[in-house]
């Protein structure tokens, strides 16, 4: 599964993030369910038995496996694959009206994947090399679309597919170059979907809210830095 995170630098100096990936769904509706899956997938002779037990106690996970299989297809380019937000957010208008939405980044270049034979023998970093060459010819663009929830679509379960077909393009994300120097001079880069701006409200999705805690722990292990008040409140 591949991902794309975007950090918007706002005029007042604050930032807001979106996080997307190639899978349209998460494998679990709760953090504990995801941890249970990781434990069941630990290598060993008892893994098949552990996985069978997991699926018996988490039957909805079966529906996520075909989605994950599709998400693992090898793209011809990072620029020819779609990325999807797992979580819903409540968008609130100036007049107080509100709708729940999920995010999608759709490649302007259209989706294009490689067959197994075409991908065979490619260098491990061929996607990065391809993107660099593509950027030499101009920006890479994605349409920023939101899917508006229908009456039966869950705003708090990232493992549940939405039935709504109401999709609106709200902007364009443009990539103009590669940033090869990250986290220098004490600058710690964190893309946290709980970091929102005015008019966007996180839902009570437990996986969404757990991500801030997970990212804070990751930063502390990786850099020794405590995010402290910089981390969004959960």
Where are the predicted features?
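Active-site-adjacent core segments of small-molecule enzymes
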Residues: 1-234
